Amino acid sequence: MVTREDFFPGEAKLIRQMFDLGLDWLHLRKPGSGEDDYRALLMELSPYERSRTVLHEHYHLAPELAAGGIHANSRHPFPFKPTGERSEAKFADERGETAFPDMSHSGPTAAYSGPTAAYSGPTAAMLSVSCHSLEELSAHKAKFDYLFLSPIFDSISKKGYSGRFTREQLLEARDNGLIDKKIIALGGITAGNIPIIRELGFGGVAVLGSVWFSPSPVTSFEELRHSL
């Protein structure tokens, strides 16, 4: 789950309800946000929920608040240096289910150095990155625990942001081993297109618009979760 860009009343409550319903990872993405507001939202989450939250900004808060990971993107390309080759992230559901997917926090440990802190060892963060082409995906795949590829379908949250890949391109990437369990589909994801995502070999999905811009975000999340 990727958050809305803005902060809004009741956001933490909705997030916590989604965790209760089986949310695996939260990507906290608030472009241009102030550190105080960012920290305040994190502090409204439980320690467990923070351990499953990946930061897109204010990376130095990750070790301080025991966040689950940090995410590189075009706004913050490489504020850290991934160390060594990253093996495939572990996709094991801690609730004993066979849901698609769940990146267990017991997956590969990370060592990175952010702007103010070193962070390594058994409680270290997951490292992820956004990719918008198959070439980017190939270049970054070995360096990160998992990678977003987008937009797969026409974006719901960004009007006019159309799917970038043909079905044939994605099937070829799957058959060549480029798309596998480390790759997360983003962009236009709904419960209705989950079967296509499965066929294309993705390890999971990241959603934003189909949940947050619906009349009932928690209900929409639950429907999506049941389709996995």
How should these model regions be labeled?
Residues 105-122:
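Long, intrinsically disordered low-complexity tandem-repeat segments
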Residues 78-80, 91, 100, 112, ...:
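Aromatic (phenylalanine/tyrosine) cluster motif
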Residues 82, 86, 91, 95:
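Cationic, low-complexity basic patches in intrinsically disordered or flexible, solvent-exposed regions
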Residues 153-159:
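A short acidic, helix-capping loop that chelates divalent metal ions and anchors anionic groups
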Residues 146-153:
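Non-cysteine beta-strand/loop elements that form the S-adenosyl-L-methionine
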Residues 1-71, 75-77, 124-144, 165, ...:
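Conserved N-terminal beta1-alpha1 strand-loop-helix module at the mouth
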Residues 166-172:
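Glycine-rich S-adenosyl-L-methionine
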